[in-house]
Amino acid sequence: MARYMIKRFWAMAATILVITTLTFVLMKVIPGSPFNEERGTNEAVQKNLEAYYHLDDPLIFQYIFYLKSIITFDFGPSIKKPSDSVNDMLERGFPVSFELGMTAIVIAVISGLVLGVIAALRRNGFLDYAAMSLAVLGISIPNFILATLLIQQFAVNLKLFPAATWTSPIHMVLPTAALAVGPMAIIARLTRSSMVEVLTQDYIRTAKAKGLSPFKIIVKHALRNALMPVITVLGTLVASILTGSFVIEKIFAIPGMGKYFVESINQRDYPVIMGTTVFYSVILIIMLFLVDLAYGLLDPRIKLHKKG
């Protein structure tokens, strides 16, 4: 176990290094600087600003300064909002993004499992076709399109929910739904397929022959083994939810990290881009690691100390 943890730690560190390096390269291959579009800024002032933010240094020194800011987790002030530091933006935005993302994940997992189990137990019946039709529809519609439709129908037409901001629980309904539907549909399809296969296994028939209750057979024996494929893709789904929240936060004017990230790309605010990229990379890698551990704990055939 200790050897596995050490290997995973170095793998996580290497992954973060690759991601941050690619982010740095992509920022630098775009011609120009963040101050090119500033109106009324003369050349001397622009050069002073570039010197202040180390943008006129050789690339190797910029990269070293960039790595130093990552190691110390101090990304300095925003270029477009000098009075606001990147760390303060992360501190304000992360709780909002975390609340939105985790709520969507919980709803997606629970709803997807319920739909998948119902569809498997009523195989080739009305509930099966209805659940899988909803799943196909959920997979087919991108979350930003769904968000627009939800706003139009439930905020503009029916006026049941607010269309934007993030000040009370009722504001969470539409963005959470837009973010959770796609992953929920994927989980439902995987659960249904896996449950159908598990329910035909010999140990399920043995459990029925022993007189165990249907609830115990489904929950204790069938569902636990059917969860393996779901857990396998859960890390990817978590990543898609967290990164998908960028667009959702922008659409619903939610003051989370996604809002800052989208604005920083449009404004070429390098410190904010670096800070949000590194922060999200660390969160996603940790989530993938936890999913990997959960997979090993649920499947006794997997020995963590033998994994590479």
UniProtKB/Swiss-Prot annotation:
It comes from the Bacteria. Induction: Nutrient deficiency conditions, which also induce sporulation. The chain crosses the membrane at residues 10-30, 59-79, 100-120, 131-151, 168-188, 228-248, 278-298. GO terms for cellular component: plasma membrane. One of its GO terms (molecular function) is peptidoglycan peptide transmembrane transporter activity. It holds the Pfam family BPD_transp_1_N. One of its GO terms (biological process) is protein transport. Keywords: Cell membrane, Membrane, Peptide transport, Protein transport, Sporulation, Transmembrane, Transmembrane helix, Transport. Probably part of the ABC transporter DppBCDE involved in dipeptide transport. Responsible for the translocation of the substrate across the membrane. This is Dipeptide transport system permease protein DppB. It comes from Bacillus subtilis (strain 168).
